[in-house]
Design a protein with these regions (language model features):
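Ordered, soluble secondary-structure elements with a strong preference for glycine-centered loop motifs
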Residues: 12-13, 112, 174-179
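A generic secondary-structure signal
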Residues: 29, 61, 190-191
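Metal-dependent amide/peptide-bond hydrolase catalytic core
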Residues: 120-227
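Histidine-anchored nucleotide/phosphate-binding helix
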Residues: 24-30
Length: 227
């Protein structure tokens, strides 16, 4: 396709071409039925939805002023073709991201006594962070803390003086979102003191969870059964 990424082998993969076709198709059908519609229907394409607050700018511009209900949908690879996934209450978790910079003292692998080994510090920190989900949050309330990147080191026999960790957290409630964030700060401070390292946590708040209204969800369910 012509609208592919300029970076070879990299794609967003959300299926926004499908979303565009779905919304335009809906607009075409409803425009043919406009005489039967009591009220106003707006069709919204949300820009910059992945972390750049496109919806926030749309709200500021007055796009949803006077809107009583809003419906959105997203393609999903786990959903069988020809079906619609419907759920009231929490359906998508709050998604935050974080970067942790660990600074120590490098040196030769044969003389570790004069160093602050960032690999050791990082390994303890990663293990400690996992206890937030397993020991601090309610097992009945789904939460996730995942570290997807560990970067650092120079060579097989050189003790690393800096390591960068990057990851994400997910929570269905604001309470758990804040709990994870606060515990991360506490654990970072404890590990920093334990190993005499310098650790900086850069935690970026993302979007709040998606919580579907029960009545509106029932409307979608009834319509889906008819279609």
């Amino acid at each position: 396709v012509e609208y592919k990424s300029i970076h070879k082998g990299v794609m967003h993969a959300c299926g926004h071409d499908a979303h565009t076709a779905m919304l335009l198709g809906t607009a075409e059908v409803l425009s043919q039925l406009k005489d039967k519609i009591k009220g106003e229907v707006r069709f919204i394409f949300q820009p910059a939805e992945e972390g750049y607050a496109g919806a926030k700018f749309m709200i500021a511009d007055g796009v949803i002023d006077g809107v009583d209900e809003i419906y959105g949908m997203h393609v999903w690879n786990y959903q069988p073709s020809g079906t619609i996934g419907i759920q009231d209450g929490p359906v998508m978790a709050a998604a935050d991201m974080f970067t942790i910079k660990i600074q120590g003292v490098g040196g030769h692998g044969a003389a570790p006594q004069g160093t602050v080994d960032c690999v050791i510090v990082a390994s303890h920190l990663i293990q400690a962070l996992q206890t937030i989900v397993s020991r601090n949050t309610n097992p009945l309330e789904s939460t996730v803390l995942s570290i997807g990147q560990v970067n650092g080191g120079y060579n097989f026999n050189i003790i690393a003086d800096e390591i960068i960790l990057r990851g994400t957290t997910r929570a269905y409630t604001e309470k758990n979102k804040q709990l994870i964030k606060n515990r991360m700060k506490e654990i970072v401070m404890g590990i920093e003191k334990t190993f005499s390292a310098k650790i900086k946590l850069d935690y970026k708040d993302g979007y709040p969870p998606v919580v579907n209204d029960k009545t509106i969800t029932k409307n979608v369910e009834r319509a889906a059964k008819i279609v």
